[in-house]
Amino acid sequence: MISKKTLITRDNFDKLILPIYNPIPFIPIKGKGSRIWDQKGKEYIDFSGGIAVTSLGHCHPILNKTLKNQSKMLWHLSNIFTNEPALRLAKKLLSSSFASRIFFANSGAEANEAAFKLARYYSSKIYNFKKNKIISFYNSFHGRTFFTVSVGGQSKYSNNFGPKPAGIVHASFNDINSVKNLIDHDTCAVVVELIQGEGGVIPANLTFVQALKELCKQYNVLLIFDEIQTGIGRTGKLFYYEYYAITPDILTIAKSLGGGFPISAMLTTNEVASVIAPGIHGTTYGGNPLACAVAESVIDIINTKKVLSGVEKKSKKIISELNIINKRFKLFTEIRGRGLLIGIVLKPNVSRNIHKILNFSLSEGVIFLTAGNNVIRLAPSLIIKELDIIEGMKRFYRALEKYLSRKE
């Protein structure tokens, strides 16, 4: 047993934690805004945002105050009761979206699990039990439960766990003919990320999403938008589907919703929700007062003209800085994404060294993510300061200099 007085080190992870992760060598102990500090006091500028989670940066004072105040009132009740923070949050999310009903959970995987179950349940009740096929897309990612990871289009995450859930097929992203070859009257849902995050920060084409909507209407199929990564202001609108002017039947959100506190939600219409009765689905912690109070404050801050328009401005600044860097080093083939979900596509001869580039970046004090095998992903705070953007890009520049001057 490790006492509180014993120094905690990265080595403790290897001895104590199930090795499903391989954390970077240092341990962060403090964060403020878009900067974090490790045990040795070294400072880093965070462009990872906890994988698009810390939408308002680290330890935002309003979120701190909200959490502290709610912790003095109610922590947990279970869904034998409802609670005021959950109902207030529900009102705000529903009034800002297409939806009329909402279900709260704790993670993106749980929200997607609920969405897939709802789609099958609705179709079995309204049509017939054979209408249960779910169409997803190659390179998509929808969570780590066995159902959601099977729906996801990356077999490396779902292989070797035994028989997979049946009735799941995969089409090629942005290829409507691929969907046409799979969809039929036994299909209950098509689920799509409007930007494939884990798959490489690849946006869905407008014509592709329009055609998906029409196909779903033709076959009485529910259209599910997975906005776990793009939702809650990440792209400069509260929900990314607003850019397409196309509404889904079911929407899932998480990550930015809690600003770092675990919460997710599934939103849907009165029509789809009409088949649900008590006991059909559930959660112990979902919609708890602490999470919902924090998420309400997140929405109050983000769902404003100042913050949402600021996302676009910050995005343009980052992309401008990246273009300057690329003009110097010529390592990128493309910079893509929307708002503050940005993908830097590396040239083929560079992408094999993507982790070396990230390690050089860490040594310079700037944190990035990967997306796929050849993309550096940026998903910083939606309110990251321009000073942090400029300094972060300077550090990235120095990291690339060192990468190019390295000796193998």
From Swiss-Prot:
> Which Gene Ontology BP terms does the record give?
L-arginine biosynthetic process; lysine biosynthetic process via diaminopimelate
Q: State where N(2)-acetyl-L-ornithine binds.
A: R144, T283
Q: Which UniProt keywords apply?
A: Amino-acid biosynthesis, Aminotransferase, Arginine biosynthesis, Cytoplasm, Lysine biosynthesis, Pyridoxal phosphate, Transferase
Main location class: cytoplasm
Provide the protein's localization. Cytoplasm
Q: Does the keyword Transferase apply?
A: yes
Q: What does the note accompanying the cofactor annotation read?
A: Binds 1 pyridoxal phosphate per subunit.
Q: Which reaction does it catalyse?
A: N(2)-acetyl-L-ornithine + 2-oxoglutarate = N-acetyl-L-glutamate 5-semialdehyde + L-glutamate; N-succinyl-(2S,6S)-2,6-diaminopimelate + 2-oxoglutarate = (S)-2-succinylamino-6-oxoheptanedioate + L-glutamate
Q: What superkingdom heads the lineage? A: Bacteria
Indicate yes or no for the key word ATP-binding: no
Its pathway? Answer: Amino-acid biosynthesis; L-arginine biosynthesis; N(2)-acetyl-L-ornithine from L-glutamate: step 4/4; Amino-acid biosynthesis; L-lysine biosynthesis via DAP pathway; LL-2,6-diaminopimelate from (S)-tetrahydrodipicolinate (succinylase route): step 2/3
**This protein's GO CC annotations:** cytoplasm
* Necessary cofactors: pyridoxal 5'-phosphate
| Sites of N6-(pyridoxal phosphate)lysine modification | K255
Q: What EC number is given for this enzyme? A: 2.6.1.11, 2.6.1.17
- What InterPro entries has UniProt attached to this entry? AcOrn/SuccOrn_fam (IPR004636), Aminotrans_3 (IPR005814), Aminotrans_3_PPA_site (IPR049704), Class-III_PLP-dep_AT (IPR050103), PyrdxlP-dep_Trfase (IPR015424), PyrdxlP-dep_Trfase_major (IPR015421), PyrdxlP-dep_Trfase_small (IPR015422)
Disulfides per UniProt:
none
Q: Where does pyridoxal 5'-phosphate bind?
A: G108, A109, F141, D226, E227, I228, Q229, T284
MF terms in GO: identical protein binding; N2-acetyl-L-ornithine:2-oxoglutarate 5-aminotransferase activity; pyridoxal phosphate binding; succinyldiaminopimelate transaminase activity
Summarizing the function annotation, the protein's role is: Involved in both the arginine and lysine biosynthetic pathways.
Could you describe the subunit structure of this protein?
Answer: Homodimer.
Similarity-based family: Belongs to the class-III pyridoxal-phosphate-dependent aminotransferase family. ArgD subfamily.
Q: What is this protein called?
A: Acetylornithine/succinyldiaminopimelate aminotransferase
Which organism encodes this protein? Buchnera aphidicola subsp. Acyrthosiphon pisum (strain APS)
Gene from which the chain derives: argD
